[in-house]
């Protein structure tokens, strides 16, 4: 986003350094192009895993390593952040400029909507509100069963009143996931004489002298000088670069003999959405067409929700048959907790830029998160009892019908919880009165001139929606103020 916007000014010279490969816009390979292939492949992934933590097991953490980043491997959902998230950030983190009303203009400037998915028509990011006829048979039945369970139909997930069930707003066209390397950095933009893209190049650290960023050191030792540095390496990589640059918690830096440039709580507020899948057998003839794999959602409040926040996303997906069910097919109904209270952390154990960071998601460390995920399983079971799902499903395979009380469901969470792959807040933003912030509303790193961070790592806490599209909005707003 920033390379696209900033290079539109011919007086600027922009160098975009990409760790992965910069494919031409129309030649991305299938794992980072096809909508039905979510999560990428080893060639286009950073290969990160979480620490075992409370779960007692390591989770695979998919992050896109290609021009376009994780927008090239994600589910391509394009939703606006709800108003109560913005209200929380303005109050709790002294971020008046991040209010809901002001943010709507930046969403509109992004959106190129052909239907009712948003109210922007001339933006740079194509989005599309799926109709019932465009989702899979399974997702249509999910919508019908949720309505039968008493949930309302959403008036639109991008509206001010997004709660309810319905099809997603997507950043896809004709089965193609439209990542930012395609949409923002098309052929015409890449041809700008003031924009250079250097791919398959890893940044080691930012060089800082006398409190001012001077350039970056690459993993091979080469140095590139610049008037301003903007890190957009993502929630797991941007904080690692900062720490190797001497910006972070003093105990981490001293332990690695890294000179301290600015002592800041980098990596101390990692958040992600925990997701609990339930597995069901289903009659094979009832599966229908499984495409697209992501199509509809119920957004609702758990029984333990607070502050008027809708904290549960419920959805469904088909799984390949493993031959273990008599019904012939299996599918998922899953609940994601989108207002978690648990907080994780990220740190580094080495100065080696090729070493993966140490990532502790912190899942289930808050007892209230456990209760709300159990609420999610109960919502799922209620939906599964309704028509048309009731005639389609066979046995509940996991956590299983034998786990019928809340205590047994709670006990099973550690073996089942996964990441919804929406990590944020390792370099959190905040206003002058927010002592826990690392950057300000424009991504400026505290105590270091000419250095910004602009990516999902700077959200004050994890938004209540899929994070890619809102992060584009955040970058759009910062770019506008840089103009």
Residue ranges and their predicted role:
Residues 146, 257-259, 378-389, 474-483:
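Internal hydrophobic alpha-helix adjacent to the cofactor/substrate pocket in enzyme cavities
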Residues 274-378, 382, 420-425, 433, ...:
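FAD cofactor-binding and catalytic pocket of flavoenzymes
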Residues 1-109, 259-268, 273, 277-282:
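N-terminal glycine-rich phosphate/pyrophosphate-binding loop and immediately adjacent elements
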Residues 9-14, 100, 192-196, 226-227, ...:
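Loop/turn elements at helix/coil->beta-strand transitions in domains of secreted/extracellular proteins
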